[in-house]
Amino acid sequence: MSNSSSQLKRGLKNRHIQLIAMGGAVGTGLFLGSAQVIQSAGPSIILGYAIVGLVAFLIMRQMGEMIVEEPVVGSFSYFAQKYWGRFPGFLSGWNYWVVYILVAMTELTAVAKYVHYWWPHIPAWVSVLFFFVLVTCLNLGNVKFYGESEFWLAIIKVAAVISMIVFGLYLLLTAGNDSIASFSNLWQHGGFFPHGFSGLFYMLAFLMFAFGGIELIGMTAAEAENPEKSIPQAINQVIFRILVFYVASLAIIMSLIPWNQLDLGGLDKSPFVMIFSQLGIGWTAHLLNFIILTAALSVYNSGMYANSRMLYGLAVQGNAPKVFAKVSKQGVPTSAVIFSSILIFGCVLLNYFIPEEALSYLMYMAVAALVLNWAIISFTHLKFKRSMKLENKVAKFPALFSPLSNYIVLTFIGMILYIMWTQGFEKSVIIIPIWIAFMFGLYTILSWKKSL
């Protein structure tokens, strides 16, 4: 692809890459999705995020090793196709595209929940439609616009979470004897595991959704100005972000009020907002709701970006219609952005017909697609390592503890499938082999047509 009408531009600077990696990891899975897990697991949710976060970090290092060696467009599908075969590449690319369609739809649905906190009279589909149009227009501009918008949205998230931790810590350290705020709330009121370890174990699949956007950095490689430097830096900082954004923030807010006294009500309310509201600090609750809304928009913005770049990559590889390989003068794959947007528009319809159930359905569908995606990345990395060994090459950014880390990841994925199967989400598990079979049939038909 040598002409200007078919190439992306390296318009993302190091600071963009760092914040995109951060932004993809902090969204609805933490700010809204943690409500249901707190009710089921209590304070042990902190350990749960640490466990899933560690697995996500291992995946990031495996992916990072491949990306630094070859910073190409459509990284996941490219590596699966090169080191595993054409069908794994075809499946990986389209599956990742579906993952981010679902993630974008989930975050967009969550935005309506946050708007509802202030204006309950506004229908969910109206809020969804407004932000859908706004973010779509943003992604049709130069990639630098996306980089800058995501940079500042992520800055807001980072500053907010750190400020909340500091403010929460201040409330804990200055609490009087009659205050309910205390670190002891983490082990009192039923203990750290109030419903036993099973209460946490069966929530791990739900927690996995929170880390669904963490591998987004792989999509930035083709548009990063210095991928060999920026990609490793961003990936290595992920573990510290997990400790701060997930572990530290939840430890602080769950110390402020006993977990069993939180008025959460399922997936409709953010525990971050409700805790400060129950403490009588209304202005903080409103400020946090605004911050959390920007967090959801940030991940949705990233989802739109990832969708279009993966679709572009599939087209370049010959696994999608060539029209999606065309880019504008600004280096934006316009056709890919528009087509992805049309699918995401389904979120507006979901919120019109089933506003109450939309978020829960989308989250578990996203986890099912994410399970397959992580498995493909880890399997592909094993084949990549075998190829590197045969060619006597030394990796510039080797994965941690490979191949042991690969087997840890794959075992964890098997465990997630078991949890989903036994906790009433059999359909999410059953749809995985059906999806693979459908994609294989489509791949076979397309391959046959190409051979004619």
Predicted regions and their residues:
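Extracellular loop-to-transmembrane helix junctions
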Residues: L8-K9, L32-S127, F131, F240-R241, ...
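Helix-loop-helix connectors at the membrane interface of multi-pass transporters/channels
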Residues: M1-S5, Y78-Q81, E107-V128, A160-S163, ...
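TM-loop-TM module centered on a large, flexible mid-protein loop between adjacent transmembrane helices
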Residues: Y78-A80, G85, Y117, A234-N301, ...
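Helix-loop-helix junctions that connect adjacent transmembrane segments
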Residues: N3-L8, I46, P120-P123, I155-H286, ...
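Membrane-interface "cap" regions at the ends of multi-pass membrane proteins
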Residues: M1-A35, Q39-S44, A56-R61, E70-V73, ...
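Membrane-interface loop-to-helix entry segments
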Residues: A112, V126-A181, G212, I235-I239, ...
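C-terminal membrane-solvent junction of multi-pass transporters and transport-like membrane proteins
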Residues: W152, V323-T334, V371-F425
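Membrane-helix boundary/coupling elements in multi-pass transport proteins
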Residues: V72, N95-A110, F211-A224, G282-K322, ...
